[in-house]
Structures are given as structure tokens and as C-alpha cells.
Amino acid sequence: DNINNSVGMNMTHKFGKKFSLTGSMNYNLNRNGNISSMYQEQYLTAGNQYSASTNEGNSKSRSFNSNIMGSWEVDKRTRIHFNGGFSFSPNRNESNSQNASFDAPPNVNHESLFDDFESISQDIKVNRSENRSRSEGQSNRYNWMMGIMRRLNEKGTTLGLNIQSSDSWGDNESFSLSKTTYFRLKDKQGNDSLLYRNQYLKSPQKNNSWRVGINFTQPIGKKMHFRAAYNWNTHYERDNRDTYELSSLAKSDVFGELPPDYETGYVDSLSNRSHSRTNGHDLNVGFNYSDDTWMVNASLGITPQR
């Protein structure tokens, strides 16, 4: 069944004349499933090829999002505004697939070919692959921002401070099981050659960022303003991937479970560790001029990073 449900709520309230608050919440549920099968025939000069495949998959995901925003007029010269949000999204996916190739027509209904696979002549079979996978994960995120604006005098000189932060993290794990039989390739005992793989993958992630800025505006006469702004920001990112080969550690009929000694199957060549941090500064100064006929802006910005 394919399902898509969503529910939400919004709220706005004023507390007196100087403080207002707005918030929202949303919840979503998605569930999808599919079943497909395919049969192909290719007529080639070097020899005809026949193949069949089937796939069954289903997925389920949920998400919750909330946001809040507020504004506070402290006095005639000072205003504070802020907002924040939080979200999390768990998900789950499963799939089963099979495919096989032949050098002659298998002469069975392709929709039930794999159920009747043993009845197909061994002489026309080339290979067969059976695959199964399952993954689960969850991502989380929050962010907030606060800004303070202060008018310093009656001329309109203003000073502002802004602070922003966001953080996201998540973890995903997946199991994959595959078995491929090569009917034209024999092992040492004379049996059909078999390639078996059972892998576990874990992928934790984390991102964090901060931004702090200060800005200043000074009127110069009635038609011109001088403005200056400075911002500092930093961003951290971590993305790991750990892969474990379970083929020699778990029984062939066990799927989706970790044996006690699974860490001994760590595969360095299929794993990855990535960590990075970026720091940046930017300084911007400029002038604004406007009258009934003209509007002119001139600015200079500098952005060093490391």
C-alpha cells in the first residue's frame, strides 16, 4: 500500500503591544511499496540472450518539524527578534530482487519464473543472482537565530548584533545480502560456482555551524548612509562510513543481525572517515545615496577563509 498522511498546526499570539509569538508543527507519514518483474530477449549474431528479473521493495518514512518565531519591542529604541526550529526524520527501507540469464528461452511464465526455477533445464542456465537489503536511519536537526537592533540616537544611528547556530546529526545502518550462482563455472568439487556476500554498513554524520555578526549604520545628512558589517562563521562536518564483511561470521540463513564478533570483519578499503572545519570572516563597508531621482549603492567586501 502507498500512503501519504500529513497533519499540521499553526499558532500566532500577541502578548500585549510589544511581544508577539508565532509557531508551527507538522507531522508527515509516507509508506510506499512496489512489485515488478521483467523478461527480455536479445537477438545477437554471437548468440541470443534471455534474462528475467523481479523486484519487491517497501519503504516507510516519518518526519516531524516545529518552528517558532518571536519579536519583542523592548523600548522605543531596542528591538529583539528570534526564531528556532527542530526536526527529526526516521526511515526504513527493504528490498528483495532476483535476476537470471539464459542462452535459450526458459519456456515458463516470467511472473513466476523464480518460483519454477528448478524446473528449467540446467543446460540453458547461465547465472542467477539473489539480493536482499534493509536499511534504517534517522536524521535530526535544530537551528536558532537571535538578533538585537538598537537605535543609538534620534538621527538614526543603529547598531545590530546577530547570532545564528545550526546542528544536524544522523545515523544510518544497512544490511545487504547477495548470492550469485555461475552455472557455467565450476568449483574444485565440480559444483556450480557460488559468490556469497553479507555486509553491514554504518554511516554516522554530524554537521555544526555558527555565525555571529555585527552591523553599524550612520546617517550622513538626509540622503546618505554609511554602513559597516562584520561576520564570523565556522562550520564543522563529520561523515564516516564503516563497512563490515559478515560472510564468514554469520550463518547463510541469518540476515539483519550482527554476530558478537562482527567488528573483526571490518573492511578498510570500503570504509571512509571524513572530518573538516572551515572558519571564515567577512567585512563589508559601503555607502547608500538616494533622492527623488537617483539611488546609488557602493560597497567593498573582504572575505578571508581557512
Which stretches of residues belong to each language-model region?
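Primarily recognizes Gram-negative and organellar outer-membrane beta-barrels
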Residues: D1-R306
